[in-house]
């Protein structure tokens, strides 16, 4: 299972998620659309983190980090249920 954000400017989807998935048996790729970037998959930051490292902590206004985390969890659970028998 490989997940990535369509707006990832750190590691572009074409040279990372899709590239690596081509070499991973049974890989399933999910690209979150829109403004989902590289750091959205990190845990929520504290106030101090947002003040110190805003690039890691602040997402585009259209991105709901908690929703991305929940969807990624659902995808992982389903993937492992199918492939770890």
List the predicted regions and their residue ranges.
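Short beta-strand/loop motif that positions the catalytic acidic residue
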Residues: 2-8
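Short alpha-helix in the alpha/beta-hydrolase fold that links the catalytic acid
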Residues: 12-22
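Catalytic histidine neighborhood in serine/cysteine hydrolases
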Residues: 22-58
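Active-site rim elements
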Residues: 59-70
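Short, amphipathic alpha-helical "lid/cap" segments that border enzyme active or binding sites
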Residues: 69-77
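Short, hydrophobic alpha-helical segments
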Residues: 76, 80-85
